[in-house]
Regions:
Chain A
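Acidic, proline/glycine-rich intrinsically disordered inter-domain spacer in sigma factors
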Residues: 13-19, 23, 123-152, 224-228
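Short amphipathic alpha-helical boundary/capping segments
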Residues: 27-31, 149-158, 203
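Short helix-capping/turn signature of helix-turn-helix
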Residues: 46-49, 57-60, 166-173
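C-terminal edge and immediately downstream basic/flexible tail or linker adjoining helix-turn-helix-like DNA-binding
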Residues: 2-11, 112-119, 149-152, 166, ...
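Short, charged helix-capping/linker segments at alpha-helix termini
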Residues: 17-18, 33-42, 52-71, 186
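Structural recognition of an alpha-helix C-terminal capping motif at a helix-to-coil junction
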Residues: 53, 67-74, 87-99
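Helix-turn-helix DNA-binding module
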Residues: 151-188
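Arg/Lys-rich amphipathic alpha helix in sigma70-family domain 2
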Residues: 78-85, 95-116, 195, 204-206
């Protein structure tokens, strides 16, 4: 639903009746600019999972990922007045998140937490072990386990390829939006996504042939579709 | 079409970005190349796995977010209400920087003054050079001159005498100029060292005296509390 700017600024009676779930992100942030905390809560509900999913696949640490997700959303609230509708709201949010993640990773690379005398084996090219589904094939793999395996596989992609890859594959941003978020040239975005896909495929290759896993994947997708339908109803 | 090019096109095609003029070429290649067909299927499955594996946030995420946001807003409001708090810290930092800069400046001025100021007459320079016209030539006995050279910068006994000898018996304050001709900061420093060392000597003497008294007390105590010899008489 599109609302005119006057309706936000002057608080028309219509506003009270509007279901926030029907309002576009870009209109919600205008409401936040006018001090409506409820609009911010709605944006949090829409973006917290997407941001966490994106950030976790970047930093691998769930605690740190939650912290950075919170930091991103707080910055959205504090700097809401800086948003201009020259770009989609999602582009703006993921730009903030990407910058925060990059800063954090830069800090971590300057201060390594652990130094080992024995260098870790070069495992970039090693595919991940597929989950052992023989123990309880009827139950299959849990969604959390799958999330952990995918996060580990994603972490094997070099960071410069991973950011555009996740923005495209998980967040479904267009190439132009990824270009805006990352500041890369369009051709570079294309080639990095292609290379990241290749690396990701190498990392999960054994899983791609696992019939039990593929069956569970179909069940997960069916459940997600049902939940979407319930939300719409 | 090579497979590497086809893989690039497959990626673009999955995102709906493949130009139509390349689509036909890719289709032809996929009809002929089983590896590239598998590659395309793998990418599709990988994308589905990634989408299905959305990680879950902890249950109290929103509550913690609200808490953190409220704290941030409260801190921001406090800064607006009491901006002097920030200014006070700024002012303290400014004073610290100023004090440091002033110390460096003072040290530099003193160093220049020491380097360029009048110096104590040395035995070789007395009566010679540009100072000779302004400085009354001190009468230094030959023996004292030698001592002056020998002790400058070392001890205080002979040095003290050499300073007084170098001044020809006059007090420094009676001399014209900032320090008076014939005086240098080195001479003043020597005098300070002398008085400091004398004070230290007095303290040391006092300590030695006290320790001697303590030692005497302990010896007398030892004499009075001395146990008899433990040597038992023979036969016991």
């Amino acid at each position: 639903m599109n609302l005119s700017r006057d309706e936000f600024v002057h608080g028309s009676p219509l506003q009270a009746r509007v279901d926030l779930r029907e309002i576009r992100d870009e209109d919600l942030i205008v409401m936040v600019q006018n001090g409506q905390r409820k609009a911010f809560d709605e944006l949090v509900a829409r973006y917290k999972g997407r941001l966490f999913s994106f950030i976790l696949r970047m930093v691998k640490d769930p605690t740190l990922a939650e912290e950075l997700t919170q930091e991103t959303l707080i910055r959205v609230y504090l700097h809401a007045d800086k948003y201009r509708e020259i770009a989609r709201f999602s582009t703006w949010v993921f730009t903030i998140a990407t910058n925060l993640v990059r800063n954090k990773m830069r800090q971590r690379s300057r201060r390594p937490l652990l130094l080992s005398l024995n260098p870790a084996p070069e495992d970039d090219e090693m595919p991940l072990d597929p989950p052992d589904l023989r123990q309880d094939p009827t139950e299959g793999i849990h969604r959390e386990e799958l999330a952990a395996i995918m996060a580990a596989a994603t972490a094997k992609i070099p960071e410069k390829y991973r950011v555009p890859f996740l923005l495209r594959e998980v967040e479904q941003l267009s190439y132009e939006e990824i270009q805006q978020v990352t500041g890369l040239k369009l051709g570079t975005v294309r080639s990095r996504i292609n290379r990241a896909r290749n690396r990701f495929r190498q990392a999960i290759k054994p899983m791609l042939r696992n019939e039990t896993l593929l069956a569970e994947l179909e069940r997960i997708e069916a459940r997600a579709a049902e939940e979407d339908n319930e939300d719409k109803d | 079409m090579r497979c590497t090019k086809a893989m690039e096109y497959i990626s673009l095609d999955l995102d709906g970005q493949l130009p139509p003029d390349h689509a036909a070429g890719l289709t032809r290649h996929l009809d002929e190349c089983a590896d590239c067909r598998t590659y395309r299927e793998d990418l599709q499955t990988a994308g589905r796995l990634l989408a299905a594996s959305e990680p879950q946030l902890s249950e109290n995420f929103e509550w913690r977010l609200q808490l953190r946001l409220n704290q941030t807003l409260a801190e921001a409001a406090a800064r607006e209400l009491h901006p002097w708090q920030d200014r006070r810290t700024d002012r303290a930092a400014w004073w610290r920087n100023f004090a440091a800069a002033a110390s460096v400046g003072m040290a530099a001025v003193l160093a220049v003054a020491v380097m360029t100021g009048p110096r104590a007459p040395s035995t070789a320079a007395v009566g010679d050079g540009p100072m000779a016209a302004h400085v009354a030539t001190p009468v230094v006995p030959a023996g004292d001159r030698l001592e002056l050279e020998a002790v400058r910068g070392f001890g205080y006994g002979a040095g003290q005498r050499s300073v007084s000898s170098g001044m020809g018996g006059q007090r420094p304050s009676q001399r014209p100029g900032l320090l008076g001709p014939g005086w240098s900061y080195q001479s003043i420093e020597d005098l300070r060292n002398i008085s400091r060392i004398q004070a230290e000597n007095r303290q040391l003497r006092t300590q030695v005296f006290q320790l001697q008294r303590q030692l005497q007390g302990m010896q007398s105590q030892l004499d009075t509390t001395a146990v008899p010899s433990l040597d038992l008489p023979e036969g016991q």
